[in-house]
Amino acid sequence: HSLTDGLRILRLAIDTHLVTARYAFPLLIARPGGLVVEVTDGTAEYNADHYRLNVYYDLAKIAPIRLARSWAHELAPHGATAVAITPGWLRSEIMLHEYGVTEENWRDACAKEPHFAISETARFVGRAVAALAADEQRERWQGRSLSSGGLAKEYGFTDLDGSRPDAWRYVVEVQDAGKPADVTGYR
C-alpha cells in the first residue's frame, strides 16, 4: 500500500468513529443506560495473534476494539456501556456476489470454499446487538471484545436458519488448524 492509501484506510477506520462519537456521545450520556457498539472483524484474542494483510489494514481491524475499551473508560461514569462486537464469517451481499450465490442457495458456495459453511447472516450480529441492548446488566460486558457466536450462547438467539454459528472458535480450531471443513459442533 502507498502511504496515501494506507492513511485513507486509517481515516475511514478510525477518524469516522471519533467524529461520530464527538457528536453522538452528548446525546448518549444525557441519561444513563446508553450503549456504544463498535463493529469490527475478529475478536481481540484472534487479532492479537494474527497479522492482517498490511499494517494499515491490521490497525483498522484492531482499532475498534481499542476504541471500545477507551469509550468504556470515558462513558462508564455516565452509566453508558461500550463494547466491540465481531460477526463471524459474514454472508454479506458482497460475499454472496463473490461466490455467485444468493441467501437462498448460499450453501452452493461451499463447493468453492468449504469453510463458508460456518458463515452467518448480517441479522445474526444484529440480533447480538439487540440482545445486548435489551440486557439491563449489559455493563458486565463493559470494554470487552465480543462475538455474535459467543453472545448467541449467552442470550439464546439464533441465525435465520435456527443455528448458532460460532465462527471464531471454528476459524481457530478448524480452518486455521488446516482441518477439513466440518461445522459439526460449531453451528
Kindly label every feature range from the protein language model.
Residues 50-51, 94-98, 155-160:
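Short aromatic-enriched loop/helix-cap "lid" or pocket-rim segments at secondary-structure transitions
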